Amino acid sequence: MPMTLTPQRDPISGRRRVARIAVAAGLVAALSAAGPVPLVLAADGPGAAAPADRDVKSAHHKLGSDDADLLAEAKADGDKNVTMMIATAPGQTEQVSGQLDAVKGGSVGRADDKLGYVRATVPTAKADSAIAAAAKLSSVHGIDLREEIPLDDPTPSADAAKGAKATATYPAPGKRTPAENPYNPSFETGAVDFVEDHPKADGRGITIGILDSGVDLGHPALQKTTTGERKIVDWVTATDPIIDNDNTWRPMVTAVSGPAFTYQGQSYKAPAGSYAVSLFKESYTTGGDAAGDANRDGDTTDVWGVLYDAAAGTVRVDLNNNNDFGDDAPMKPYKDGHQIGYFGTDDPATDIAERQPFVVEVRKDVPMDPLGGSWVGKKSDFVNIGVIESEHGTHVAGITAANGLFGGKMDGAAPGAKLVSSRACTWSGGCTNVALTEGMIDLVTKRGVDIVNMSIGGLPALNDGNNARAELYTRLIDTYGVQLVISAGNSGPGANTIGDPALADKVISVGASVSKETWAANYGSVVEKKYAMMPFSSRGPREDGGFTPTLVAPGAAINTIQTWMPGAPVAEAGYSLPAGYGMLQGTSMASPQAAGAAALLLSAAKQKSIDLTPATLRTALTSTADHIKGVQAYEEGAGLMNIEDAWDAIRDGATSHSYTVKAPVDTAIDDKLKTPGYGTGLYDREGGLKAGQKKTYEVTITRTSGADKAIRHELHFENNAGGAFRIVGSDEVRLPLNQPVTVKVQAAPKSAGIKSAILEVDDPRTEGVDKQVLHTVVVSQPLKYTFSAAGTVQRNSSQHYFVTVPEGAKALEVAMSGLKDKSQTRF
């Protein structure tokens, strides 16, 4: 059936445009003359459509293009306030903090001078002037506005064929499932063999931060490490009590005294003393998996009194609703004694838990200014009732470090590691960038973590990694020596779909791969390819040509979900799962595989007294990752993680110099880059390159660390698709310290399509590849009025076609025919 698609971005006058069509089965495609628009179309199999981009404004200003749109939306919607996150030069927050705090009705909610971070809220009517004044300060590097990032649905149910039948190609996983298995395929990164070869380097001694939707404290596989220590050592909430509209934070503004008091028409008893009181309604969690039923009794109407003793730092929750706090145990924040409360009463005779665990947390002196009115200039303490928002965080935690899944030998990647849970997601289906920024800062600077996994992100209009949050993440890595591992996003299979903040320069961004065995075991799906990328996995490069994803790891797993939810297998797999276990998919599942595997390397290095810095860890991983047959560099990055080879590189002294790269970028919006027309990798999408033509590019490389002399480097193209790229002249270059050197490379594609390769710049005297530079060119087919193609594609795969769209075209139609009955093929 013909289909007309509207543009994602406005046409750019005078520029040629390339449209990409991705299809997923045998087909014939016909295109009517199309408007100048990049088109990304979904592939067969599990996936998520890429969101429509906003119009892109200038990215040269300190307020990003997305953020300028957010400000316009706030004005149009009549929002009372806007909140901004500001990256300043480290140690230079005082000036902008004072400036914003002085705005009438404005307040500074958080500042970290060492890192260079300020979060402030100002009235929307004063936002333009406040932002303009802040942007004029040389100490201010970037400004992001608060927004909520949707949490992708990791369940594959939306992609299942209607009426599909269970095939039961594999039995259900259980207590007898071995450590090496296709259900939770940690063995594909080398994690299972590594633990077998190094049993004391199973993650012990390492603490992993999980910035997500919260981790279930009641799951049996998340109770103990392999050495019998507590698995979850801290549990906090990263959202802001006011600006994130998270009502699990209760304002302690009503003072009362024991032994008796009245609050909201109810009489209460309490031990003698001075307190503050509030109420917690289970309906506050309506947007999460609990659907507002915190105590699992089938309704959403329950309310509990909350009593706060500021002097003691304790909280009592009237769980039995007898209005007497005297029989409720005073609770401290989880890290101070690991106290857990429960909403509801469990029936041990059932598979599912009829209760939900919670913890408490206290945040002191929160500015109340965003509430306006009489609250301006005041501060208050808040108490958080810490419950999980969804299954997402628990599943991520299990993949990372579960110990004894199903009570057997099946584990997460690093079963000996400890965990810290930080909930950054709210009750409206997403996580705010404020919580994701401040939660990350809190985990790295205050919670004693050695590595952090964050499986949350979104595709911005300009995904070049040039924003305040990306800069702050890079600083956290450099300043505190903690590696951040982040999911690449689920907006594939198109190129240039990497999400933010996986764009940040020094994070490990992780794409999702899958084996033939996992397709069969977890989905009941029979495929021919032995190993491939997940169709939904976001692909590189960044808009500035940057190297993303960093690498890939398995992106589907059966693992832990909250124990108060029933088992959640894929129906077509043909088996059931017990409560507390589910099959989820996404780069959200790939990232914790990588984080857990990296934790094994940190564990081994710690035992061997090896100083494994984030830079060394990244060098070892990217230098040893395995290429996936038939997968291009822009899709897989360095390839499939291989920690056994990475460990060999670490023991051999893996190290690398630092470099900057300036390479030409020709895209529809390259004028919006930090340096218009240039980026950190070669990316030619709009340059008109044709099959059979040759085009030479100049890539400038500057070595910024190491000896103050010229050092010989070898140049080599790896994963060179179709042999499209070659080095012009010598394959060796001498790089002095801090002096740019230009290297010429040539693209000579033999056929249409996207071609990519990794230019390796390597000092042969160092262990590992020193620098990898992604090269990507797009060769489109000419289009006068129509374009037709015929072919076949394997199940759960995709086929890409690029066409040159005539200037001035207003519409694009794609007609697809020749499909088999009940085919799920789509474009």
Enumerate the predicted regions with their spans.
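A short beta-strand micro-motif common to beta-rich folds, especially ectodomain repeats
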Residues: 699, 753-765
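N-terminal domain-start motif of subtilase-like serine proteases
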Residues: 56-78, 123-132, 153-210, 214-228, ...
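Secreted peptidase-domain scaffold signal
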Residues: 489, 643-747, 769-823
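Extracellular S/T/G-rich loop segment that most often corresponds to the catalytic His/Ser-adjacent loop
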Residues: 355-373, 381, 502-595, 599
